């Protein structure tokens, strides 16, 4: 209304990425609930409303698979060192985002313990999950769910780590759509200084 008073006409309003994603125990609003909550304020303006549903569509379309390399129980905390790290999925370190982490092949004969799932980058922020109750053994494969939104695009080569491969699953078929980066591929554009 203030913009209209200033002679700045609007044709639409973009409310951004409003729809949330269920990571833990949240209940994000449905599209209808979201629209109904905004309708009283926006309807009288007569504007088209645009929304960017990106994360609500893509987050649960992707999972990061990681292997348990080493179990390191201590008197204070139990650490599961995994082969994924903060360079593969930065959201937990950057935003303290809670990611649902599940065993791909759950073990029913292994004791459930509380674990911190940490990478091998040796940074205090290198974790994908803290205080997770899981029955773990070395070489177990874990799925970090909800990693489809911004997972790969925010990944990096920190500590000269190649980014993970990407696999697209369509029905019962899996297709490699991006190969895992290798040390050689990371170095291929680097050059040494000429010898004198």
Describe these PLM feature segments.
Residues 6-12, 48-53:
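Flexible, glycine/charged-enriched surface loops at secondary-structure junctions
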Residues 24-29:
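Short, solvent-exposed loop/turn segments at secondary-structure boundaries
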Residues 1-4, 10-15, 114:
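Solvent-exposed, well-ordered amphipathic alpha-helical segments
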Residues 2-6, 34-46:
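Alpha-helix-loop-beta-strand connector modules within alpha/beta enzyme cores
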Residues 13-22, 53-55:
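Glycine-rich beta-strand-to-loop/alpha-helix junction loops that act as flexible
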Residues 37, 46-196:
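Charged (often Lys/Glu-rich) extended helix/loop segments that serve as interaction or gating elements
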